[in-house]
A protein has these predicted regions:
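Active-site hotspot residues in diverse enzymes, especially metal/ion-binding acidic/histidine motifs
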Residues: 1-279
Length: 279
C-alpha cells in the first residue's frame, strides 16, 4: 500500500493530467487512448506473448498487448501514462495476474485507477443510476465497470481498496462471481462478448466496444450511421451486436452517444482501430 502523502500526490497528478490535456473535471469518465493521443504519444497495439504493455520514454510511444481483454488494455494505457507522469522512465510491464510488488508498478496502478475512476465520477453516475453501494448488485457493478472502461475485477478493486466505497464483505461476495452468470441475468440472448447497457445515465463518453460485443438500449432509441450493428429482436429492449468496425450514433429525444467499434484483438496504430480491415 502507498503511504497517505504519496497517495494524495498521485491523486492530484491524475486529476491535473485529465484537466491539462482533456480539459475535463473529476466528475466525468475519460478514454485513456484519447488522453495519450492528446499528450502526444504514439499508441500501438502489438502481439507479444506474456506482454501487458510498455512505455518508451525516449520515443514517446506506448505499446499495449493486442491479445488482452479490452478493459485490461484501457487500464494498461492509463498505467503507462502513469509511468510517464510519475517520472519512472522506460518500463516493460509483463503479465502478472496477482499484481506486482514493485513500488513503481503500485504507483502506476494507483494512478491509473484514479485517472479512470475518480470518486466524483463514480458518485455522480451511481446517483444517476440509483445505485446504493451498501447493496451493490452484480449487474450494477458490471454495468458501471463498462461505463468506466474497466474489467469487472479492476472496477471492484478500485471501489474497495482505493475509493473505500464498498465494504470488504461486498468486495469478497462480488469478486468470485462468474461474468457469464452476470451476463446471462442481464440479457435475454446468450452473449459471448461483453454487454454494454446504455441509457440517459451514460453521459460524457462514447460507447467503445469491439466486434462481437453487445449493446442493450431502450426501445425508443434510433441508430444513425454506417450499418456496423445488427439489431436483434427482444420484447422489452433493443439489443445490438457489433458486427463491423466503424463509428456511428445511438440516440433518442433526450440522450445520445457515439458508438466506436474496433476490430477484435486489433494490432496496429490506435487511430486506425475503427477502420475496416483491408484484404
Amino acid at each position: 500500500m502507498l503511504n497517505k502523502v504519496r497517495a494524495n500526490q498521485i491523486v492530484a497528478k491524475a486529476l491535473q493530467t485529465r484537466k491539462k490535456f482533456l480539459n475535463v473535471g473529476a466528475n466525468v469518465p475519460i478514454c485513456p487512448y484519447n488522453l495519450a493521443e492528446s499528450m502526444g504519444f504514439d499508441i500501438r497495439f502489438v502481439n507479444i506473448p506474456t506482454f501487458e504493455g510498455m512505455y518508451l520514454a525516449d520515443d514517446g510511444v506506448i505499446l499495449i498487448s493486442a491479445d488482452r481483454p479490452e478493459g485490461r488494455k484501457r487500464f494498461t494505457c492509463a498505467h503507462e501514462i502513469g509511468h510517464h507522469i510519475l517520472g519512472h522512465g522506460t518500463v516493460i510491464d509483463e503479465i502478472i495476474e496477482t499484481g506486482s510488488d514493485k513500488k513503481i508498478e503500485k504507483e502506476a496502478d494507483f494512478f491509473a485507477g484514479m485517472l479512470l475512476m475518480p470518486s466524483s465520477a463514480v458518485l455522480r453516475v451511481s446517483k444517476d443510476l440509483g445505485v446504493d453501494f451498501d447493496l451493490l448488485e452484480p449487474q450494477e457493478a458490471y454495468m458501471l465497470s463498462k461505463y468506466f472502461g474497466l474489467s469487472f475485477t479492476a472496477f471492484l478493486t478500485q471501489l474497495y481498496f482505493n475509493l473505500k466505497l464498498i465494504s470488504w464483505a461486498t468486495y469478497k461476495n462480488l469478486k468470485p462471481i462468474k461474468l457469464q452468470n452476470i451476463k446471462a441475468s442481464m440479457s435475454p440472448i446468450k452473449a459471448s462478448g461483453q454487454i454494454f447497457v446504455v441509457g440517459d445515465w451514460w453521459r460524457e463518453r462514447a460507447i467503445d466496444i469491439e466486434v462481437g460485443d453487445f449493446i442493450i438500449a431502450d426501445n425508443d432509441c434510433d441508430f444513425e450511421g454506417p450499418q456496423i450493428l445488427n439489431q436483434l429482436s427482444s420484447l422489452d429492449v433493443q439489443i445490438y451486436e457489433a458486427i463491423s468496425p466503424g463509428i456511428s450514433k445511438l440516440s433518442n429525444d433526450h440522450w445520445g452517444a457515439y458508438i466506436r467499434i474496433s476490430r477484435k484483438n486489433y494490432s496496429g496504430m490506435y487511430q486506425f482501430r475503427h477502420e475496416e480491415e483491408v484484404e
